Structures are given as C-alpha cells and as structure tokens.
C-alpha cells in the first residue's frame, strides 16, 4: 500500500479542505481515463492525484482550463450532431 504524506500538498494548496476538493477532482479525471502527469506504480487515482499536486503539476487553475476546453469540445460535437439531424429532415 502506498503511503502519501500530504503536508507538502497542503502547503501548495493552502488548506486541507481545498486539497480534498482538488485531489478528488483530479482523481476523478484519472479514474475516467486522463493520463497521469507522474510516473505511476500501480497506484490508485487518489494517490496519483496527491503526488501530482505535491509536485506542483496540478492546481485548480489548470483543472479549470482543462474542464473549459473539454466543455467547448463537447458543445461543438453536440452542435455538429444537431446540424446533422437538421440535414436529415
């Protein structure tokens, strides 16, 4: 079982509550198929997320930018699907 100390991650984020929110958000991304930014050794997404935060590779701003880009892509795909359906009518 991997042991992770969160003190360095807390120092980067500000407090434990914000760390929990950020780590869970990133762990969810990893569980859904996002590529990790650190080398992994068969670790769970939560451990990977904490390591990424601790190393300064992930923060709220980066996740916000990624989420906005993903939302724009999804919106564009939905608009293309609607346009394709309109062409059928």
From Swiss-Prot:
It is an enzyme of class 2 (transferase). One of its GO terms (biological process) is DNA-templated transcription. The keyword Cell division does not apply. Keywords: DNA-directed RNA polymerase, Nucleotidyltransferase, Transcription, Transferase. Transmembrane segments: none annotated. GO terms for cellular component: DNA-directed RNA polymerase complex. One of its GO terms (molecular function) is DNA binding. It holds the Pfam family RNA_pol_Rpb6. SMART domains: RNA_pol_Rpb6. It catalyses: RNA(n) + a ribonucleoside 5'-triphosphate = RNA(n+1) + diphosphate. Its EC number is 2.7.7.6. Promotes RNA polymerase assembly. Latches the N- and C-terminal regions of the beta' subunit thereby facilitating its interaction with the beta and alpha subunits. The RNAP catalytic core consists of 2 alpha, 1 beta, 1 beta' and 1 omega subunit. When a sigma factor is associated with the core the holoenzyme is formed, which can initiate transcription. PANTHER family: DNA-DIRECTED RNA POLYMERASE SUBUNIT OMEGA. Belongs to the RNA polymerase subunit omega family. This is DNA-directed RNA polymerase subunit omega.
